[in-house]
């Protein structure tokens, strides 16, 4: 009796008299709840990637104390913080999955944690409070930490539930649509990501951190509302209650987990490299000529090419590349992932080569590069033979015994510099022994090329893993298995954070510098790709769907 009472308490299933459906409808078409999930995902991903896009730039160029004084992090410190945050966001899926599958169900879990998510965005928006309010509450770094913790809990907790919720809407009659719907689900992710990646860097530069972090929060509130609107259209798979733990951690459940975990360890290496698009690649873009194709890019805006390419690649791969390739070779999910790994190696090799070009140009001038993206007065005690500065207009500037940038260039000024002449043109100013020279900094086009390759890898790895993880999970473990896949993102980012931590010197900078940093990760990915060939050969797949009989999931 006691066990039955506990089960009734913890199950929290909507009463059967409610309008909620508890099994997929037999239809060959798209389930009615899918548009609400896809719309929710587009707005939620706008909020997450909009915030994530500017995080490194905020920490290294905009983070202040409560009194308004600079409290910037070094590039290495910012990379570590960034990857620890992403690792946390992809750790909480395990907790969210257990809550959803055992106690609350996916719908209630998503709705509740979405509110936590919104609270996190609010904390980030409060970074721009007046100094008196910051001194009385938390300083900007404190609000940042509070916001990132809440966002990690909220976004992480809902991740496995949302993707598993997509699969729950399908039965055997329309299972042929699952692959395409997961593709369009991923399309929605990148639709939101594309616009936020363009917008939030502009908001940060022109309106400050409050607006840059606040607008994504508004979109998260919209995402929550859209999801709530679809409540009567969804299939609500009932939570299992205390039975869940016996089913999950019994022989058949553990067998499914241990079968998939080795695969996810390899996928973790992909995410280690991929997620550096928001950290190391942003820092690399700061060292490049950002004039490309008639556009002056902001360093954190270059990432926008990734979701734009995803929007192009998803239909291209689904309707052109996969059908053509299937005439030559059987494209199993694991083979797609293997090809994606190989492309990831190529993309990081391109980034490493571009970094080598940057180092070659720096060595040509034997220079100290002074950061030009600082706020307030900057006292510099240094002698440099070369200097780079970002240009915001098209005219050349020539000054005697002083160097100044116009106020529309973030208000930066350098005064009393001991130099003969300076020229600012095409984003570069270089002086050497009193003479003016033109530097040939590598174009940001190199990084865009790397994005073209790694985005193709993302389509092959990430979308495939979403579909593969859902279909390979026993039906009572859909959210949990999806969370283990997402945990691979966490492990990959922990690996990146650990590399930055263990190579950090006393001043907070990495000893693994320049192209060596990129070549290190390239070699790690080569090793993972070679070893993954054995997984492709040995793994034996099996599908599970929600309208399978219960006995099928016990095998």
Identify the residue ranges that each predicted region occupies.
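A gly/Pro-rich, aromatic-decorated transmembrane alpha-helix motif that marks the paired
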Residues: 53, 94-98, 126, 191-206, ...
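Central cavity-lining transmembrane alpha-helices of secondary-active solute carriers
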Residues: 83-100, 304-317
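Intracellular loop-helix junctions on the cytosolic face of multi-pass helical membrane proteins
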Residues: 2-39, 172-179, 183, 188, ...
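Hydrophobic core of transmembrane alpha-helices in multi-pass small-molecule transporters
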Residues: 135-158, 365-366, 441-460
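Intracellular juxtamembrane helix-capping segments at the cytosolic ends
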Residues: 157-172, 460-473
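C-terminal ends and interior cores of transmembrane alpha-helices
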Residues: 115-138, 343-360
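Conserved MFS/SLC helix-loop-helix module at the cytosolic interface between two early adjacent transmembrane helices
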Residues: 93-113
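Short amphipathic helix-loop junctions that connect adjacent transmembrane helices
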Residues: 53-77, 279-299
